[in-house]
Amino acid sequence: MLGEIKTAQADIRDLDLGVSQFDIIIAAAVFHHLREDGEWSSVFRKCHHALRQGGAIWISDLVSHPTREAQAVMWDRYGAYLEQLRGPEYREHVFAYIEQEDTPRSVLYQADLLREVGFREVEILHKNGCFAAFGAVK
């Protein structure tokens, strides 16, 4: 039997994922748009409920750093990349957009939250600067 792929493009806070509907959830550049801790918790819990036992969530997203010093270094590196890509105006545009629209959290915050809502295995696949790929198994 062939598997079925379902895609969704919507505000994750409003999306009804159901219960035990999926074997895998892939969230790319989704969660950094969440604002308050309550939203983070609610959405992670929703994803946990939507997965079948043994299912997994895999996340690739913009992340922050828990220490100011590390955040400053990583932000400088990201800014240099953006400036090299399209110039200083582009860097300022991206940073202004992030400041207005995004609230990324650290990988450690998200890993702890995945465990808190019931995921049993958390795996960090990759982290480079302000971006990370990680996931968890239900």
Segments from the language model and where they lie:
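A conserved beta-strand element that flanks and buttresses the S-adenosyl-L-methionine
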Residues: 26-27, 58
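Short catalytic micro-motifs in class I SAM-dependent methyltransferases
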Residues: 29-33, 61
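Conserved SAM-binding strand-loop segment of SAM-dependent methyltransferases
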Residues: 1-13
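A short acidic, Gly/Pro-enriched loop at the edge of an enzyme's catalytic core
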Residues: 13-25
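Hydrophobic beta-strand segment of the Class I
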Residues: 25-26, 114
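Core SAM-dependent methyltransferase catalytic element
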Residues: 111-138
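A short glycine-rich, Lys/Arg-flanked "PGG" loop and its adjoining helix->strand segment in the class I
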Residues: 41-53
